Amino acid sequence: MEGWQRAFVLHGRPYSETSLLLDLFSESDGRVRVLAKGARARRSSLKGCLQPFTPLLVRWSGRGEVKTLRSAEPVSLALPLTGSMLYSGLYVNELLARVLEHETNYSALFFDYLHCLQHLAAQDASPEPALRRFELALLGYLGYGVDFLHCAGSGEPVADTMTYQYREERGFTASLVVDNKSFTGHELHSLASREFPDVGTLKAAKRFTRIALKPYLGGKPLKSRELFRQFVPAANLSKPTSSDK
């Protein structure tokens, strides 16, 4: 790769005694795996900056699947994520590491990711709206096109008071059936606008994104969800702001 580009570390693990194997999310090349040689050495200048949520400028080289990291510089301090916001950030990172194609440009998604982290770092009352907006944006970039505003059967605009059944590869059709794949027209309007004014629309958005992301994630559970369940105090798990992602 010629020149520098912006990137974040999605995930890293030790490689040999002194190196790190990193999954990066870069502005121009999307998800890239790099080997950071000597990054774990005691005197390495990279030791402190190759952490999740730290905005970086990076350069790498190589033609294989694993590149060699040549340089990395922090653009600023790491975004301050703590508590449920930290686990939410880890969830977003794991999601990207699992579903993004290798070395594919997602430059617009890069900024959606940055905005999501900034919202989480602002320590708002709940991470849920930012997570749902990001998931919906991600689905769009993955090619998961859904028309939330029209009935797939009739083509008519959805009505707030009617119920619609979601069917994969078809969209939403008017239905009297009420189950996990049923959504009101009011909820569909919220999904289309990515604005969630109440608990009901937030829960509906979570149901939809879980249904839609399942084919991309397969049967393997997300580790960040399990970490959240293990380490967040049980009292918080019942609160809307601390529900598993």
From Swiss-Prot:
- Read off the NCBIfam families from this record: reco
**Coiled-coil regions listed:** none
**PANTHER family per the UniProt record, alphabetical:** DNA REPAIR PROTEIN RECO
Question: Which GO CC terms are listed, alphabetically?
Answer: bacterial nucleoid
* GO biological process assignments: DNA recombination; double-strand break repair
Q: Which organism is it from?
A: Pectobacterium atrosepticum (strain SCRI 1043 / ATCC BAA-672)
Superkingdom of origin? Bacteria
Which lineage is the organism of this entry classified under, starting from the top rank? Bacteria, Pseudomonadati, Pseudomonadota, Gammaproteobacteria, Enterobacterales
InterPro entries tied to this protein = ARFGAP/RecO, DNA_rep/recomb_RecO_N, NA-bd_OB-fold, RecO, RecO_C
Q: What does this protein do?
A: Involved in DNA repair and RecF pathway recombination.
Q: Does the keyword Oxidoreductase apply?
A: no
Q: Which gene encodes it?
A: recO
Task: State the protein's name.
Answer: DNA repair protein RecO
